[in-house]
Amino acid sequence: MDLRTMTQSLVTLAEDNMAFFSSQGPGETARRLTGVFAGIREQALGLEPALGRLLSVAHLFDLDTETPANGYRSLVHTARCCLAHLLHKSRYVASNRRSIFFRTSHNLAELEAYLAALTQLRALAYYAQRLLTTNQPGRLFFEGDERVIADFLREYVTLHKGCFYGRCLGFQFTPAIRPFLQTISIGLVSFGEHYKRNETGISVTASSLFTDGRFAIDPELRGAEFERIIQNLDVHFWKAFWNITEIQVLSSLANMASTTVRVSRLLSLPPVAFEMPLTSDPELTVTISPPLAHTGPGPVLVRLISYDLREGQDSKELSSFVRSEGPRSLELRLRPQQAPRSRALVVHIHGGGFVAQTSKSHEPYLKSWAQELGAPILSIDYSLAPEAPFPRALEECFYAYCWAVKHCALLGSTGERICLAGDSAGGNLCFTVSLRAAAYGVRVPDGIMAAYPATMLQSTASPSRLLSLMDHLLPLSVLSKCVSTYAGAETEDHPDSDQKALGVMGLVQRDTALLLRDLRLGASSWLNSFLELGGQKSHLKSVSKTEPMRRSVSEAALTQPEGSLGTDSLKSLKLHDLGLRNSSDTTDTPELSLSAETLGPSAPSTINFLLGSEDGSEMSKAPEELNNKDRVRGVGAAFPEGFHPRRCSQGAMWMPLYSAPIVKNPSMSPLLAPDSMLQTLPPVHIVACALDPMLDDSVMFARRLRGLGQPVTLRVAEDLPHGFLSLAALCRETRQAAALCVERIRLILNLPGPPV
């Protein structure tokens, strides 16, 4: 169904439902249902033209006709998913509204949540139009005055996000992955609630189990808490949460479910300089020094994974590098039979935002790769920020890569074909390691496979970056915190002083007291939640402000008197919050308006983001599809008159926007590398996600390489989130996307295809 037909069908159903519920009397339920369908009608009619304009020019930003992918397309697709859900729900309401089994409160809550999401998506469409009229032709990232982009990003982060993490969580992704995303979001908000208490692992687990069931029962509460976490908690929280998979129990369970391999050994490479031959003249050598940045010389940890035990992998020389991991170190001694060395070698660099995870986190899919490719894999455990900011990780990865090239025989490979592979931050490091290898004059890999890589670390805007408003893994504030930490910016000290003061016994006593308290409060929370779901009213006379016992929106929104519903309520999406009332409604905080009247007239020396380039030569090069009407759209208000997106109730959020020269360094942002550097890269194969906030990183990097005549391919996985490699075993769609990565590596290594 095309966009216009979908919109017209939704508007027709909304008007029919409005007419029905407006005739049901003056009750609160009927009034709210009438209002929500009025809001759906208004937002759908306003959104359709904006999406149409984006879609009409989206093809100008594709890599080629065979790869229709960029942030504009992704934004339109996401809005279509929201419209499709509202269309389905509106049809359901129209068919069942007279039934005695019609769940009024549930359907109202879901309609309100998706109306809020549709309103925010409409705002994103207008932001995308502003980028379209301001960016240079064919460019997805904004390039210009840094003050302008800072103002744009600070304005963007004030948008309300909680609606995307409650009932609407993951609506844009494939249905098979949504239950997993819900589990992750519940775990994140539970983890966040106990994070600041400095609790030990057992206390966090027990507290989350008994007290945080309300996050599963109440989607609106979960969304509000998720929004609070992504705005207020520092990078140490995200580092701790993303490293949960490193816990021994969880990693053991993952290993039990993954492919069994003969070799999985952690190696420690000593910080010793060695010589490497130059590719231009093998008789000449260059010295590869050990990593030195920030902490001085130190060992580099790597993990060798091989499905078969191959020659060299049980040698005494390699064993001297082995770092014991317990029983797994005995695995080789039980299997003395050896296979010949493989022609191929894969050097892998894991992702994790430069701040989290290790090769152990990525071991499950690496084992599958080792089996499918029949080649050993060396995964690098580089040092993480904030303890080891840029360029420590790059130095360690380059050192480990050179060591692997020089000692490939010990790793079970002849080294005829070498592939660099990585995901996310690891993809970034794959590019920069190869650039450094070319600069040193040593052997570059035969190809690079980068899954959803980060190629632009500078704080800037692009259409796909707008998707971070609803992304569960890569909210813009989290991206900014990770990048600033990797760049070496000052971060808040991790609050561990209390733990040091208490000591071991003090921690045990404190955690015991907290656990008993949480058991007591948790039982009360669960009981009240289930009583409310059963329709019984419970009046809490005394509720702690730090741990509120909130009622679900399904009951509270329908039983609360009209006058007591605050305009800033997180539990009920009032119609005036969605821009359906005039601006005379009072609010606790003023609406942020980007109209010309609010911003005031621009002085000649002031750069106005809402205006196109004053230099007509730039815009004269734009394709005909970008007509004059689109170019001057920003001269008036940022949004149409009467439209006001929801703003964040958490107050103004501080987000570091780093534009220091270091983030423009090609070793941090390879997209900004000069042509002469990019021309030294080997064939590049990128596998991206259509709904990833970093999609434009992949598209623009591929476009740059293609423009230089460099061999590059781009494959885009549909309907999947960033990080799908770690979810490879979850569903058919993630398995297919992971198989696409393996197929790209196989192409680099010149390996035969898998048996049919």
Curated annotation (Swiss-Prot):
This protein's pathway: Glycerolipid metabolism; triacylglycerol degradation
Catalytic activity: a diacylglycerol + H2O = a monoacylglycerol + a fatty acid + H(+); a triacylglycerol + H2O = a diacylglycerol + a fatty acid + H(+); a monoacylglycerol + H2O = glycerol + a fatty acid + H(+); Hydrolyzes glycerol monoesters of long-chain fatty acids
Assembly notes: Monomer and homodimer. Interacts with CAVIN1 in the adipocyte cytoplasm. Interacts with PLIN5.
Cellular component, GO annotation: caveola; cytoplasm; cytosol; lipid droplet; membrane; mitochondrion; nucleus
Biased composition (Polar residues): 581-596
Family (UniProt): Belongs to the 'GDXG' lipolytic enzyme family.
GO biological process: cholesterol metabolic process; diacylglycerol catabolic process; ether lipid metabolic process; lipid catabolic process; termination of RNA polymerase I transcription; transcription initiation at RNA polymerase I promoter; triglyceride catabolic process
Signal sequence residues: none
Domain of life: Eukaryota
Modified residues (Phosphoserine): S552, S554, S595, S649
Post-translational modification remark: Phosphorylation by AMPK reduces its translocation towards the lipid droplets.
Region (Disordered): 542-570, 581-600
UniProt-listed InterPro entries: AB_hydrolase_3, AB_hydrolase_fold, HSL_N, Lipase_GDXG_HIS_AS, Lipase_GDXG_put_SER_AS
RNA-binding as UniProt keyword: no
Pfam families documented for this protein: Abhydrolase_3, HSL_N
Function: Lipase with broad substrate specificity, catalyzing the hydrolysis of triacylglycerols (TAGs), diacylglycerols (DAGs), monoacylglycerols (MAGs), cholesteryl esters and retinyl esters. Shows a preferential hydrolysis of DAGs over TAGs and MAGs. Preferentially hydrolyzes fatty acid (FA) esters at the sn-3 position of the glycerol backbone in DAGs and FA esters at the sn-1 and sn-2 positions of the glycerol backbone in TAGs.
Subcellular location(s) of the protein: Cell membrane; Membrane, Caveola; Cytoplasm, Cytosol; Lipid droplet
The name this protein goes by in its record: Hormone-sensitive lipase
